[in-house]
Regions:
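Structured adenosyl-cofactor binding patch, chiefly the S-adenosyl-L-methionine
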Residues: 34-35, 49, 53-61, 119-156
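Active-site/ligand-binding-proximal alpha/beta "capping" segment
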Residues: 88-137, 141
Length: 156
């Protein structure tokens, strides 16, 4: 059963905006679990978190941390009220992840495979981050980028 909690509990959050590939969502849930995050909020336009492929990719992480479907705008307001800084992911108007020092509390918003994070959500962040790419590839898969950023922000 999906958690009903609407309270902000915990210090580290992953917010997922309109990610459509079940393998990506499942991998991000599993990665958030592995990185020790407190909760995952899955926004509108994202694939069903109980899709068979999501469950397979998550490898049981649904049982380890709260995964809540919700309105990301409302959740961002709640997180801000609890002094949790919100970081977005973007290619424009963003700073390298290396310009941010690790923090003990944060929320990270990651976005749709083709469109990225919704512009309205990006305007609500304290900073938008990008991952430097040193090779010839133009981008990273959203679940891979999520893992890199979560572990970077969580490092001691």
């Amino acid at each position: 059963k999906q958690p009903e909690s609407r309270r902000v509990e915990g210090k580290t959050w992953l917010l997922i905006d309109a990610v459509q590939d079940p393998g990506n969502i499942g991998t991000m849930i599993r990665t958030a679990d592995s990185a020790g995050l407190d909760a995952v909020i899955v926004g509108e336009g994202s694939v069903d978190i109980y899709n068979a492929k999501v469950l397979r990719a998550a490898q049981g992480s649904h049982f380890h941390l709260p995964i809540i479907r919700g309105n990301l705008h409302q959740w961002i307001e709640k997180l801000e009220q609890n002094n949790i800084p919100i970081y977005g992911t973007a290619l424009k108007n963003a700073v390298s992840m290396y310009e941010v020092t690790p923090v003990d509390k944060f929320a990270l918003i990651v976005g749709n495979e083709g469109q990225g994070v919704n512009e309205e959500l990006l305007r609500k962040t304290v900073k938008n981050l990008y991952i430097p790419i040193y090779g010839k590839s133009e981008s990273l898969n959203v679940s891979v980028a999520t893992g890199i950023l979560l572990y970077y922000l969580r490092r001691p």
